[in-house]
């Protein structure tokens, strides 16, 4: 892969193909944002879901915070204790950024037990190392 640091572009040579594709870095409001070009030079189009993924929710996501747009969940359902998702009663996990069944949460917590256990383990290790 040839890289040109001055231009911020990478040229990708595909095996068995004469065409070349380019990736260009798009540095705007979010420096992590990148856009890819297809071998024909056109921008790749992704599926854009403009509403919350919870059943029967028509919340418009175009003006939502970037976090909620990225995870396709409106602010109300991200914080709701129970939502109907995929026909099941679930809750949005703040650590995983996914919906889990209610049985995976302790009481009213917003993070699933598995992720909380990992978080607590890391906390115990770091506090143990400092003593």
Curated annotation (Swiss-Prot):
It holds the Pfam family SBP. The gene is SBP1. The keyword Cell inner membrane does not apply. The keyword Zinc-finger applies. It is found in: Nucleus. Its main location: nucleus. A motif (Bipartite nuclear localization signal) lies at residues 109-125. Zn(2+) 2 binds at residues 93, 96, 100, 112. Keywords: DNA-binding, Metal-binding, Nucleus, Transcription, Transcription regulation, Zinc, Zinc-finger. This is Squamosa promoter-binding protein 1. Residues 1-10 have a biased composition (Basic and acidic residues). GO terms for molecular function: DNA binding; DNA-binding transcription factor activity; zinc ion binding. Zn(2+) 1 binds at residues 52, 57, 74, 77. It comes from Antirrhinum majus (Garden snapdragon). The SBP-type zinc finger is required for the binding to DNA. GO terms for biological process: flower development. Residues 1-52 are annotated as: Disordered. Probable transcriptional factor. Binds to the promoter of the SQUAMOSA gene. It comes from the Eukaryota. A zinc finger (SBP-type) spans 49-126. One of its GO terms (cellular component) is nucleus. Gene3D superfamilies: Transcription factor, SBP-box domain (4.10.1100.10). InterPro entries: SBP-like (IPR044817), SBP_dom (IPR004333), SBP_fam (IPR017238), SBP_sf (IPR036893).
């Amino acid at each position: 892969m040839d890289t040109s640091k001055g231009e911020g572009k990478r040229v990708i040579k595909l095996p068995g193909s004469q065409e070349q594709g380019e990736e260009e870095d798009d540095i705007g409001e979010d420096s992590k944002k990148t856009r890819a070009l297809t071998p024909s030079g056109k921008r790749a189009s992704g599926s854009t879901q403009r509403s919350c993924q919870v059943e029967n929710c028509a919340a418009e996501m175009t003006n939502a915070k970037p976090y909620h747009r990225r995870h396709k969940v409106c602010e109300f359902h991200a914080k709701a204790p129970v939502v109907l998702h995929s026909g099941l009663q679930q809750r949005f996990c703040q650590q995983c950024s996914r919906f889990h069944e209610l049985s995976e949460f302790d009481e009213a917590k917003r993070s699933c037990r598995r992720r909380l256990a990992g978080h607590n383990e890391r906390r115990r290790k770091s506090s143990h190392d400092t003593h």
